[in-house]
């Protein structure tokens, strides 16, 4: 995500009762909708000139329906069940502004997904990216946001639900927490059973679930780390979660945001390998099974965070989608574990 906070873990926890079944496993990938215009701040000179291997096979721009349909085909064929689209409020800290929201280029890919003729191959949901520049303040604005979702997204047959409730993920959940009850009430008023709310952050009450957006060792600055150290970090954190709390684990494709830094100051991970990523995914499945989690979800960071080094989409440097194919192998692994 272009606006990154040095919050090193966003952990999400689901509360379920019955044993997990392989067919319940759903794997989602976060979709960063920042590549729609030439003026996007995501296109840094450093990214374009020094990291050309990260360019997706369809080019940097993703703002036409043919490319979205191609992404749906590729993702669904390889085991991705849904995209979690980053969604941005307008106006920052101000009153709900539907006109400005609809005009945001950062919602282009979500709009294209809704129009795609092959969207029945995947589900989708919303991650509210309520960070600086897209802050939501006050009960009324949170309620209007959910009302907008109900009118424009929840009614779509492909919207992801759990227990017949639309799934909404909160990037900065503490800001939204006081208004969860009101948001649920708004969803009920719109004809739904309520929301299935997932918070990025551990230990917050009122949410139905929790998950990470991404995670890395933020204490290490300007330091090169081995790829497998990233997985060790993520798995160490989730293993500390109390047994009574059921976790929707994160699997990260990588972290290296040097293309977005004028001065390289954050940790980054090198020596990427498909085998290490596959084992990372397998351990997430094992983790879900060990905690008897139904309706199990694994979240992957990310489908297309090219600037931050977290991407599954096939690129110039991975034209055959070798990392993406590990997701399909994970589905087979889950079936064998059944």
Residue ranges and their predicted role:
Residues 1-5:
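Positively charged n-region of N-terminal signal peptides that target proteins for export
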Residues 6-16:
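Bacterial N-terminal signal peptides
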Residues 18-22:
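Sec/Tat signal peptide C-region and signal peptidase I cleavage site
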Residues 23-338:
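Glycan-processing catalytic domains of CAZymes
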């Amino acid at each position: 995500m272009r606006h990154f906070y040095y919050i090193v873990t966003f952990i999400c926890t689901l509360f379920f009762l019955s044993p997990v079944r392989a067919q319940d496993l759903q794997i989602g990938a976060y979709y960063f909708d920042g590549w729609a215009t030439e003026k996007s701040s995501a296109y840094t000179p450093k990214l374009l000139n020094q990291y050309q291997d990260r360019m997706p096979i369809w080019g940097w721009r993703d703002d036409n329906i043919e490319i979205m349909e191609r992404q749906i085909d590729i993702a669904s064929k390889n085991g991705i069940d849904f995209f979690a689209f980053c969604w941005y409020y307008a106006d920052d800290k101000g009153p709900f502004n539907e006109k400005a929201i609809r005009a945001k280029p950062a919602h282009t890919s979500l709009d294209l997904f809704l129009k795609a003729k092959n969207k029945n191959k995947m589900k989708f949901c919303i991650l509210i990216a309520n960070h600086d520049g897209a802050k939501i303040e006050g009960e009324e604005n949170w309620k209007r946001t959910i009302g907008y979702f109900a009118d424009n997204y929840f009614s779509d047959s492909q919207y992801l639900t759990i227990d017949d409730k639309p799934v909404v993920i909160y990037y900065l959940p503490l800001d939204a927490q006081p208004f969860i009850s009101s948001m649920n009430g708004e969803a009920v008023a719109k004809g739904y059973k309520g929301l299935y709310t997932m918070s990025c952050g551990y230990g917050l009450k009122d949410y139905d679930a929790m998950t990470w957006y991404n995670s890395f060792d933020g204490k290490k600055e300007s330091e090169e780390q081995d790829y497998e150290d990233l997985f060790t970090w993520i798995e160490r954190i989730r293993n500390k979660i109390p047994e009574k709390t059921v976790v929707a684990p994160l699997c990260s494709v990588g972290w290296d945001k040097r293309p977005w830094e004028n001065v390289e100051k954050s940790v980054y991970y090198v020596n990427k390998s498909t085998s290490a990523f596959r084992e990372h995914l397998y351990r997430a499945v094992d983790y879900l099974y060990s905690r008897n989690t139904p309706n199990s979800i694994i979240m992957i960071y990310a489908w297309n965070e090219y600037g931050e080094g977290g991407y599954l989409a096939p690129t110039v440097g991975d034209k055959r989608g070798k990392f993406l194919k590990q997701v399909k192998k994970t589905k087979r692994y889950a079936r064998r574990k059944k």
